[in-house]
Amino acid sequence: MGLRRSRRRMPDERPEAEGTPGLAVELCGVRRQYGRGAGAVQALAGVDLALPRGTFTAVMGPSGSGKSTFLQCAAGLDRPSAGSVRLGGTEITGLRENALTELRRARIGFVFQAFNLLPSLTVEQNVLLPLRLAGRRQDRRLAAEALARVGLDGKAKRRPGELSGGQQQRVAIARALVTEPDVIFADEPTGALDTGTAAEVLGLLRHAVSRLGATVVMVTHDPAAAAWADRVLFLQDGAFAGRVDDGTAEEIAARMAALTAGARTGPQADVAGVAGVAA
């Protein structure tokens, strides 16, 4: 989809760092520590990960395993204490805050449990908001196309409050897709939905990957949701502890039960290698 850019230099026009071709997300030795001394908390303990473009990855783990911190560091919402993060080949760890903000607006899509739609804006305006914030032309045809993809034709002039929870999450997915981002980060996107509606939303994310070539990284606690992904990576104590490829909800639930019981299921080095380019 061609978009006219503003005169301001956008993050996706920056020269790319030397990342591995074909990768959407790369984390190298990422650590995140909160506090100092005896009271320090190591939320991430040296995470290495490489996720190819056009894949759907779910991240699971027990409470306190580092899932939220992983997503925040990978998406540029939090800065690692050590290590590097690349999105679409661009090193983001050392970017200044304003450049990082512009990069998120132009090259990352977000889908949250709480939808995060602005109630005073129409559905169309909510979908176009990332383009507006990024200083790009707000083409109403792009909004119509994105809404059609998620099955919301004819809803452009509605307000979020006039829609069901499932429809609001569809709007959030359309908003995430409108900039054709390098990666979509989804944080518990079905947590507030009933089972049937959750399946519809997950089907849209799956379609975005399989048919549109999007890359999705989803944090979830639900094995049934994770089963929609190509692979499920498990975090424990701030490090990857195992993975399941094309697993059923039952297989994923069994692995989660083992983690919750404190069983390590595999070394991080193996997870990082298999989750890379060869995946």
State the predicted function of each range.
Residues 239-263:
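Conserved beta-strand-loop-alpha-helix hinge in the C-terminal portion
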Residues 22-229, 235, 240:
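ABC family nucleotide-binding domain
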Residues 14-20, 262-278:
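Intrinsically disordered, low-complexity terminal tails and inter-domain linkers enriched
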Residues 2-19:
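Pre-NBD coupling/linker segments of ABC/ABC-like ATPases
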Residues 65, 187, 273-279:
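Extended, compositionally biased low-complexity polar/Lys-Gly-rich tracts
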